[in-house]
């Protein structure tokens, strides 16, 4: 059987992009694939505004697949529907030169540093957790003047590494 990786939301009924759906050789690592037929994706770079990553921003979905609104919740609808058929996903992403969509974070999880740069903590936390010495990592700077990183060490791995280095644990 075939298995496809894709991206979509309930509000976009649900497919926006998928890897491999348009035939062999149409999958690309680190992306969720090509945008589906009849759907258009644009990237709102004003939502991110990071000079180091100017091609990233909020993923905006355009198409007949976009919901009309949230049932009995006009306020929430106004926050995400720009105009009929145009939806703010709340996800950060980028399109490469061939039209493959990559998801890079969430708009609401980002925060601004004192130097004006925006940070999406999830990729940094995931990189820290690649170390066998780190059990969990949380990066936060929302509503703060400083950014804080809390690391929960993997004590078993830490003791083994110290022993291998000749340090008495």
What are the functions of these language-model segments?
Residues 1-27, 40, 47, 135:
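Gly/Ser/Thr-rich phosphate-binding loop
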Residues 8, 33, 91:
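Active-site glycine-centered loops adjacent to acidic/histidine catalytic or metal-binding residues
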Residues 10, 118, 132-136, 157-169:
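Conserved C-terminal helical docking segment of ANL/AMP-forming enzymes
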Residues 90-92, 131-155:
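C-terminal boundary motif of the adenylate-forming
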């Amino acid at each position: 059987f075939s298995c496809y990786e894709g991206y979509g939301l309930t509000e976009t009924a649900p497919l926006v992009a998928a890897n491999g759906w348009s035939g062999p050789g149409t999958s690309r690592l680190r992306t969720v694939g090509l945008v589906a037929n009849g759907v258009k994706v644009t990237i709102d770079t004003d939502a991110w505004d990071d000079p180091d990553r100017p091609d990233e921003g909020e993923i905006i979905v355009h198409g007949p697949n976009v919901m009309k609104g949230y049932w009995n919740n006009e306020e929430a609808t106004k926050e995400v529907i720009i105009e009929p058929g145009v939806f703010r996903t709340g996800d950060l992403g980028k399109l490469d030169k061939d039209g493959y969509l990559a998801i890079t974070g969430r708009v609401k999880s980002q925060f601004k540093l004192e130097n004006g740069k925006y940070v999406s903590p999830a990729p940094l936390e995931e990189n820290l957790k690649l170390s066998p010495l780190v059990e969990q990592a949380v990066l936060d700077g929302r509503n703060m003047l400083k950014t804080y990183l809390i690391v929960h060490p993997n004590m078993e791995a830490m003791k083994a590494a110290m022993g291998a280095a000749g340090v008495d644990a």
